[in-house]
Amino acid sequence: MLDFYSQRYLHSERQAWQERIEQGQIEVDGKTVDPTYPLQAGQTLTYWRSPWVEPEVPLQLSVLHRDEDLWAIDKPSGLPVLPGGDFVYHTVLEQLKIQYPQESLFPLHRLGTGTSGLLLLGRSTLGRRELSRQFREHICRKIYRTVIGPCDLPEKFECHQAIGKIPYPQLGYIYAASSHGKPAQSYGRILARSPEKTWLEVEIRTGRPHQIRIHLASLGYPLLGDRLYGPGGVPINCRTARPSDGGYTLHSYQLGFLHLHTQQAIKLTAPLPPELITPEVKTIALETEKH
């Protein structure tokens, strides 16, 4: 029993699994057993996990657009989209049910926990089906804003580094730059430069997990504050870092798609967080305030 849990579920140490078994938190066919109990095929294992308090995260969901088929919200950084790990109710999916109980809304694409900005929600059957198709067929345009350190990238640049799974302690695997991964395409342009920072806009034509973080890191310029991905687009030596860790700034800025009834092009934009407003724009705003 102990060997099974400690070798299969690596998120906890062997000693932790032993304590859970000895405390009766894990049952075999409804009965408590010793850590050395030999398991057999066909048995039912039950893990009675203790209740836990979910981490505090921003829960506000600003609605940017709504019609009979879809909504668009401004997701705050730090709020996961779907339940997983330590998060159930502190997620976009569950907060939609709590804050808008009369609606039937479901996220049509994913944003990383640390990513803020535009998130499309299907409201009707047509909206969920057709917008999912547009995402699947790469009809939707997805444009992000982010910030990296000083760089010598050209004003416009591309990255086509493949992204796939690689082994990673604790989690089993993680997505990173990999020659055996799936194709990924990102197209970026420089918005502004300073001695300490570079502001970027990046359009992704594919939707691989953590694509922008991996691609910019693979070019030698990880997102400022990213604890996970280092130069080369692979995890840095900090083996305790996880994909959901924050610290970086990445914003889903614009989404373009076809209207479900008229087929006309629609573009939605999310307000920029203060850290992504470029120096030129800040200067103009200050001059305007003076006048």
Swiss-Prot record:
UniProt keyword annotations, A-Z: Isomerase
Keyword Membrane found: no
Catalytic activity: a uridine in RNA = a pseudouridine in RNA
Entry similarity comment: Belongs to the pseudouridine synthase RluA family.
CDD domains reported in the protein's UniProt record: PseudoU_synth_RluA_like, S4
Annotated PROSITE patterns: PSI_RLU
SUPFAM superfamilies: Alpha-L RNA-binding motif (SSF55174), Pseudouridine synthase (SSF55120)
UniProt-recorded name of the protein: Uncharacterized RNA pseudouridine synthase slr1592
Gene Ontology BP terms: enzyme-directed rRNA pseudouridine synthesis
